Amino acid sequence: MSHTSLPVDAHQALLIGRLWVPGQGAHVVAVTPLEVLDLSGLASTCSALLELPNVATRVRAHVASGQAKTLASTAETLAHSDAAQRAEAQAWFMAPCDLQAIKAAGVTFVASMLERVIEEQARGDASRAEAVRQAVVAVIGDNLRNVVPGSAESARLKEVLLAQGMWSQYLEVGIGPDAEIFTKAQPMSAVGSGAMVGIHPGSQWNNPEPEIVLAANSRGEVVGASLGNDVNLRDFEGRSALLLGKAKDNNASCAIGPFIRLFDDHFSIDDVRQCDLSLHVQGPEGFVMQGSSALSQISRDPLDLVSQAMGKYHQYPDGMLLFLGTMFAPTQDRHGPGQGFTHVVGDEVSISTPQLGTLVNRVTTSDLAPPWTYGIRALMNDLAKRHSQS
C-alpha cells in the first residue's frame, strides 16, 4: 500500500480513520498526506465523532488548533497496514468505523439485478449461468433500465413478467416500492485496507462487490463516505435467498476503507452521486479482471436508501454504515468457457475512485483469515485503561 490509497485531492480532503496503536488499541484519527493525527480530544470512537454537530468544521478546527498530536507518518502507516508486512510493534490502519451498524442495500442497479435473477434461476450452479443468462435477457432485455422503482410503470411491468413466468424476488426489491436492506456485518467486524478478506471455504462461485459506503449518524444525517467490498457468495445465495446471511456475513467478508471522507465544501453527496468506481483483480496465476460501477446508474437515490434503512421505524443510536450496492456482476470466464468468474486464494482486489482513494485487500478463506477478536468489550477496556492513565 502507498500514497495511491489517498484521494487525488488529499491535500483538501477531510479524512478520518482508526489507527491501531500497539499497547493502546484503537484511536480515532485524522489523516493528511503526511501525518496521522489523534482526534481523541474530540471523541473516543468514530461513532461518537460523527455525532458531533458540524463535524467537518469541528475536526478542521481541532487540527488547525494544534490539539491533535501526531501519532504516525501516513506513508509508513499505509505500508504497515499491508497484512503481509504488518508487525506487532507498528501502528496500522483499521476499518474506519467502529460501533456503527453495518448495513447494505442490494439489487440497486439493473445489471446486478439481472445477475441476481440469473443466480436464482441457475440455483447457484455456475455451470448453468450462461445458458440461463441468455434466456433471462431474451425475456427481460432492457425493459428495466428506465423503470422508476415503486412507480405505476414498475407495477405494470411486474404484471407482464408474472404472466411470462419471469417474476423474481430480486425484481421485487429491484423495481418494487421497498429496497432490499440487510445486515452486512456486525459492528467492529469490518476489516480495513491492506487486510485479508475472507471467502467461505465451501463456496465455489463468489465475487467482489465494489461499492460506495455512506456514513450516517444516529440522526440519519449522512456526513461522509468510504469505499467497501461487499464480498459475496453467489452459489450460496443462488441456492436460496434464505442463505443471504451465510452468503454475506462471514469472518473478514466485509472490507471498508481506507478512510471515511467527511462532507464539506470540497466533497458532498452530489459528488457521491457521480462517483465512478473502478475494480481491478490480479490473480496469483496472472489472471486479470477489471470492472467498473457508476453511481449515476443507481436505480434509487442514495439518500432514499438511507431513509429506507433508518428512520422513525428503525433507529441506530450509534449510527450506520450503508453499502449502496453495485452494478458490477462479473461474467468473465476464469476456469473454463461458461464458468464465469470466481475468486481464488491470493487474489488482490483493488477498489478505487479519485475522491475516496483505493481500498486494497487480498483474498483468503474465512477460516484462514485472522479471526475477529477485537470487539466492543475489548475497545471499552482499552478506552477505560487510557482514561485511567491520562
What are these regions (language model features)?
Residues 26, 31-66:
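N-terminal cap/recognition module
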Residues 2-19, 58-283, 384-388:
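Active-site microenvironments in enzyme catalytic cores
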Residues 35-37, 43-46, 230-233, 358, ...:
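Short, surface-exposed beta-strand-loop junctions and turns on beta-sheet-rich folds
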Residues 1-14, 22-25, 232-390:
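Catalytic-pocket segment enriched in acidic/His residues
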Residues 20, 29-30, 215-216, 352:
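Well-ordered beta-strand positions
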Residues 28, 35, 101-102, 213, ...:
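Beta-sheet entry/capping signal
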Residues 19-24, 32-33, 219:
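Short, flexible beta-strand-to-coil junctions
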